[in-house]
Amino acid sequence: MTQSCTLTLVLVVAVLAALATAQLNFSAGWGRRYADPNADPMAFLYRLIQIEARKLAGCSD
């Protein structure tokens, strides 16, 4: 019984240590590094592609 309690305690400590390491390596800006704060160029390209797709669809008739 003592051996299983010791093993459980060691596993819990190992998991908590791994979680603490992960928290130390996390940075708040990580998820935002690929986000473009100015999405206007993306919207322009999207509209341009839509216009060209409509032109191509009109040519196939």
Swiss-Prot record:
Tell me, in one coarse class, where this protein mainly resides: secreted
Q: Which GO terms describe its cellular component?
A: extracellular region
UniProt keyword annotation of Secreted present: yes
Q: What molecular functions are annotated in GO for this chain?
A: hormone activity
**Keywords, ordered alphabetically:** Amidation, Cleavage on pair of basic residues, Disulfide bond, Flight, Hormone, Neuropeptide, Pyrrolidone carboxylic acid, Secreted, Signal
Which residues belong to the signal peptide in this entry? 1-22
Q: Which residues carry this modification: Pyrrolidone carboxylic acid?
A: Q23
Q: Which compartments is it annotated to reside in? A: Secreted
Residues with the modification Tryptophan amide, per the entry, are: W30
Family per similarity comment = Belongs to the AKH/HRTH/RPCH family.
Q: Which protein is depicted?
A: Adipokinetic prohormone type 2
Q: Which organism is it from?
A: Locusta migratoria (Migratory locust)
